[in-house]
Structure formats: C-alpha cells, structure tokens
Amino acid sequence: MDENESNQSLMTSSQYPKEAVRKRQNSARNSGASDSSRFSRKSFKLDYRLEEDVTKSKKGKDGRFVNPWPTWKNPSIPNVLRWLIMEKDHSSVPSSKEELDKELPVLKPYFITNPEEAGVREAGLRVTWLGHATVMVEMDELIFLTDPIFSSRASPSQYMGPKRFRRSPCTISELPPIDAVLISHNHYDHLDYNSVIALNERFGNELRWFVPLGLLDWMQKCGCENVIELDWWEENCVPGHDKVTFVFTPSQHWCKRTLMDDNKVLWGSWSVLGPWNRFFFAGDTGYCPAFEEIGKRFGPFDLAAIPIGAYEPRWFMKYQHVDPEEAVRIHTDVQTKKSMAIHWGTFALANEHYLEPPVKLNEALERYGLNAEDFFVLKHGESRYLNNDDENF
C-alpha cells in the first residue's frame, strides 16, 4: 500500500467502528450451529477441515502460507527476471480504440438500462462479466461480486502498473444493491483498494465481505466493518440468508502486496451452496488436486467461473495460472454443468496474444468432447441467465 493509500484508509476507517468479525477458530472445537450475525464468534455450521481426506491450509516454519501440493513451484526472483527480460511478449494489444471495440466490445450491463430487473428471485441463476475476474452473480435471492476491480490499473498506484485495455462496463454507483463480495487473494488485480473503498462507501456495513485468512486487518484499515475471514473449508452466510453457504475452498496460488508480506495472507477459491443453485469461483490458480476434492464434496455445481488467461510462458506461469486446457480440467474436476471464462481480455499480464485464450479454450473443449455452451465466453458487460428447469442447463 503506498503512502496516499495508507492515509486514505486511515481516514476512511475512522468513519466505522472496528467490529469486523474475525471468524478464527481451532479445528478441535465443537462444530455447532453457525450464526451469520455480524458480531457472532460462534463456531461454524460445519467445518470440513475435520475430514481427514481434505487438503488443509499449511504454513511453513516462518509462519507464512505454503502450497501443499507437488504441483507448486515458487516464482523465484531469477525466474521472474528471466521472464521479464528474455521472453518475448506476444500480447499485441492494439492501441486503437476502434480495433479494440471491434474485437472486444464493452456492453452496457442490463441493470443500467433496466435496473428493476436486477435480482433473480426464482430458481434461476444470472451472471454478468464485468471484466477480468469480476463477476456479478445473482442466485438464490442474493447478489454478490467476485474480486471486484473497477480501477484503471491493477497496481498500488494509478499512475503506473498494468493498465486496463478494456474499461469497466459500469461504475460502482451503477451497480444494483450488492449483498456480498468474495475475495480470492490479495494481488492487485483481484483486491483493488479503490474499489473496496467505493463499495464500502456506497453499501457500508450492509455489505458482507468474505475474505481469506490473514486479510481482516487490511479490510479494517479500509473501513470495512462487516468482514468474515475464513480458512480453507470454513464457511459462513449473509445475515438473513442462512440457506446460502459461502465456503472458502483451496486453490494453488500465492499472495503479495508489499515488499515483505509474501504469503502472510491465504489464497483460495469459493464454493457458494444455495437451496436452488451451486456456484464455484476458482479465483486465480494453477492446476492442482484440490479441484477434485471440491467436486467430490460440493458438486455438481450449476455454474463455475474459471480463469483462462495470463498463462504464457508455461515454464513460468503454469504453477500459478492455468491455461485453457487446464481450465477445462477444472470444469470437469469440480463437476460443474456450465462454466464461464474469466481472467482474460482486460489486463495484459502475461505473454500470450490478447485474443488467444478463447481460441485455445474452444480447442480444448473439442478435445474433451464438450461444446462452447458448456464453457462459454461472455463479452464485457454481457449477462447469461441459466434456468434450472432448462434441460440443457
């Protein structure tokens, strides 16, 4: 966090009482009924960490989180330098707005022109892609966001760092009422300070934040009051919507925002389990055995949001970012009926051509005997409504 960000956060935090909920518990405690109240410190409804066959979060000797699978390799400084200096960048993002508008149009979301239609109240599910890993999900009488970033840059500063080449389809003020936000990890393209501040200013303590273990203090400094911090396999709910369960589930990634804070915060995916629908958000991840575990416990899902971009060069990126073929493997592992593509077409974060991910996705789907509707790609601002009553759902 830069100095301006720190000062802004201190000023903002003084507007709210420091009553964020630290849902931290020992796995040996009783597993009784959960209370999704903002001030609850009771145990969880069901702690899946008590099951011996789930992969639990793990810390190294230095107290920092580590990936527990052999599929992981740390991104060393020499390898980072090799990537930045030696590898050719094939992203080829055009500078022409006209060309970008033709190739990657940004649509006005339905909720701007027809705000009265926001909120799915029947058994259906609707998703709207707002760019990168930001998805607005409407299901089971709730509306929530994943990894919201509405800023121009994914960076500590809005004057440098990765810049959007496709604008956000809407502003935060144009969103319908949001009940919850899911954060997968603390990288700048998934946890955006300005977006957190703006969402908190608009919705206040009526907005519930679900965040990984270790992120609560940062959220408090931003002034967020209604925060639930979870370990892998822990769960909680939005007050008044206890039939919809938000479970923090594993992924293979890492965390860092400042020079010395590597992996002090956990990373993960989210499994949202409702009476009518089940939604999976993969966040940012390399391929690992966790997804079979998630599918075994919570599948089949009705819809999953799975990343397909930022994967080249593979020798460096494969540990932290899946490629389109691995995304299809996740689709299969978590046992989802449909998937939507995220984490592409917004920021140039790796070396593949900016239009390549959907092409590679379709090739992978063919190899797996799936069609484009099984794992679909939306335009920026586009929505997709899925109905449980539909035979093709």
Curated annotation (Swiss-Prot):
Nucleus in keyword set: yes
A biological process from GO: phospholipid catabolic process
Effect of H380R: Loss of activity
Cofactor-binding details, from the entry: Binds 2 zinc divalent cations per subunit.
Extent of Polar residues compositional bias: 1-16
Bilayer topology annotation: Peripheral membrane protein
Catalysed conversion reaction: an N-acyl-1,2-diacyl-sn-glycero-3-phosphoethanolamine + H2O = an N-acylethanolamine + a 1,2-diacyl-sn-glycero-3-phosphate + H(+); N-butanoyl-1-hexadecanoyl-2-(9Z,12Z-octadecadienoyl)-sn-glycero-3-phosphoethanolamine + H2O = N-butanoyl ethanolamine + 1-hexadecanoyl-2-(9Z,12Z-octadecadienoyl)-sn-glycero-3-phosphate + H(+); N-hexanoyl-1-hexadecanoyl-2-(9Z,12Z-octadecadienoyl)-sn-glycero-3-phosphoethanolamine + H2O = N-hexanoyl ethanolamine + 1-hexadecanoyl-2-(9Z,12Z-octadecadienoyl)-sn-glycero-3-phosphate + H(+); N-octanoyl-1-hexadecanoyl-2-(9Z,12Z-octadecadienoyl)-sn-glycero-3-phosphoethanolamine + H2O = N-octanoyl ethanolamine + 1-hexadecanoyl-2-(9Z,12Z-octadecadienoyl)-sn-glycero-3-phosphate + H(+)
Regions crossing the membrane: none
Tissue: Widely expressed. Highest expression in brain, kidney and testis (at protein level). Expressed in adipose tissue (at protein level).
GO molecular function list: bile acid binding; identical protein binding; N-acylphosphatidylethanolamine-specific phospholipase D activity; zinc ion binding
Recorded family membership: Belongs to the NAPE-PLD family.
Assembly and oligomerization: Homodimer. Bile acids promote the assembly of inactive monomers into an active dimer and enable catalysis.
Protein name in the entry: N-acyl-phosphatidylethanolamine-hydrolyzing phospholipase D
Species whose genome carries this gene: Homo sapiens (Human)
Gene name linked to the record: NAPEPLD
